[in-house]
Amino acid sequence: MAEGDTILRAKERLSDALVGQSIGVSAPNPRGRAAGIERLDGRTLAGIDAHGKHLLFDFGDLVLHSHLGMSGGWHVYGRGERWRRPRTSAWAVLSGERSEAVEFGGPTLRVLPASRVAIDPQLARLGPDILAPEFALDAVVGGLRAAPGRTLGDALLDQTL
């Protein structure tokens, strides 16, 4: 399973390869989870945000939300470079000028309006990202103190803190 530090590195690789470019989009796997992804084709990728194990690709008024789960992964290749996995196993391909990013597997790959990100049930329940530059330790400590009977193990597993 991809952990937060792995997602942060993926965000950096993906950002270096694609941010600021007009992106071609395809979903080669006919059973892929990329419903609505064609709406992103030709749009400029403004940025990518990592929040815990989630990646959010900012296309202006639309966001591509990716969660890799236990077995998913984003691969970055040079345009025309041979992929390590078959094309038909790709859920999504984001093609820039010189690079392309390919998502294989993962339980979540969806497009949502940017206006819904803050209220989306899957994303709104997430607590602060400890790897984010703006991480506020005081807020987490306050959350822990608000439930003094909770065990440390339960607190660490609670993503809303």
Residue ranges and their predicted role:
Residues 1-63, 95, 148:
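Extended, highly charged segments
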